[in-house]
Amino acid sequence: MANVLVNAPKTAKRGSVVEIKALIMHPMETGFRPGTMGKIIPRNIIERFTATWNGTEIFDMEMSPAIAANPFVSFFAVASESGTVGLRWTGDEGFVVEERVVIAVE
Amino acid sequence: MRALHFGIGLAIIFAASWAAAQVGADKRRSGTQDMGEALQKMQDDDTANPGMLFVQLGSQSWAKKAGTADKSCADCHGNAGTSMKGVAARYPAIPKGAEAPVDLDGRINLCRTENQKAERLPPESRELLALEAYVAHQSRGLPIAPPADPRLDAFRDQGAAIYRARQGQLNLSCAICHDDNAGRKLAGVTIPEAHPTGYPIYRLEWQTLGSLKRRLRNCLVGIRAEPYASEAPEYVMLELFLMDRAKGMVLEAPGVRP
Amino acid sequence: MDRRRFLVGTAAIVVVPLGSASATPEAMAEAIRKVVGDSAVTESRVTLDLPPLIENGNTVPLVVSVESPMTVADHVKAIHVFNEKNPQPNVFSARLSARNGRAAIGTRIKLGDSQKIVAIAETSDGRFWSASADVIVTLAACLEEST
């Protein structure tokens, strides 16, 4: 089950810069840690986080095993026009999660 | 039990051991105050506190039907914002018809088995922690208020005795660290006063949410004592004692701790 | 959690090196070279914010920000963060544009040990800028039994 917390303003002035913060539940297993039987636990990370504004990509981040469990990312965006910010996380084991928030620009 | 001196033998561990706690002004410190600014900010910002992911998960479980009774928590308890407000602040408590106290996760599991007719959720399982976090979150900002039930006294006293007894290969008591040496550094880490203000906590060391029991186990392992079995009554006794010791302090669940 | 042990008395905490999987200053230099090629890197314009004392290396808040007008003509195109001692030198690489308005990224990283962190920004004119920070990581006390 997708478990995501996104923080973005519901409204923004046209042309202003807004901060978008996103937190997602994920173990970010490094692939370097030994498990119970001394066997390495297979890597299971989010590899990529992208954001779009009304479909146009505005942010793209490639992650590594050095990103902490339950990854948190904050970034900025220019509130160009009212619309939908789409957030997408993809990773190992076919992990795909999408979340959308709507920002009204006035 | 505010002894002024502690045995000189302890000097192997702490150069000078001294009871700093004093009667009078409330000088108690939540573990939050021992953390750096960055971690305090992480705890205080709901969209940055990873524990809030579990609270969100818990709110989903709250509304999900389970067991042969096919009932959700919400079916009986309604809106948790009102029905669960203040509940975490007064646990452990003795359920109706029972004789021994249960802690909050014990109480939730009672509802699982008796009211939902579902299987118990395993200790430290994600679903149990999420429900516990969701329930505890409803008491955030409220003072810890243990119930005035005289039947609890005997259990609490046993908890106090455990707290003060030396144990483990290192022959230490909880009190030696958490009363007499709180605020000092141990291998670079500040020893907190051990107030259960934030539970369940998102502990960075665990990279996940965990219960007060798990935290206590860590301290027992730290002093090389055999931790009690995962659902042993000793944990509830210790929790009763710790909650009483922290009476009036504000609940912060879900806390963030290093 | 056998890796680290809580030893009162000697106040010692043993860290078993991660062995061959460990990144090194050389591996970091190599990873940086892959990004910047032969270009010069100027230590300016980039700010790397980390807590002065890291209480647990599992989750370390980090903010990288770059001075830039963030216009179409002059903006930050990419921000990369590297480390010396985690198993791999790359921490993250992000692509930005004028649409971001502000060149700042916050995240949380894992740091297995005290080490140097480097952030590199590439601006739209193809130049590279950097900042670095030396971080000290405290290892947690009172850990789990072996899991």
Predicted regions and their residues:
Chain B
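Short coil/turn and helix-start
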Residues: 67-68, 168, 229
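The canonical Cys-X-X-Cys-His
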Residues: 70-80, 131, 159, 170-181, ...
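Conserved short C-terminal alpha-helix that flanks the catalytic cleft of nucleotide-sugar-dependent
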Residues: 62, 162-163
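Post-cleavage N-terminal segment of exported redox proteins
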Residues: 2-54, 82, 92-157, 183, ...
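N-terminal, post-signal-peptide region of Sec/Tat-exported proteins
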Residues: 46-79
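Non-catalytic, surface-exposed connector residues within folded enzymatic/regulatory domains
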Residues: 70, 122-125, 171, 232
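Short cysteine/histidine-rich zinc-coordinating motifs and their immediately flanking basic loops
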Residues: 84-91, 186-192
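An amphipathic alpha-helical core segment
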Residues: 175-209
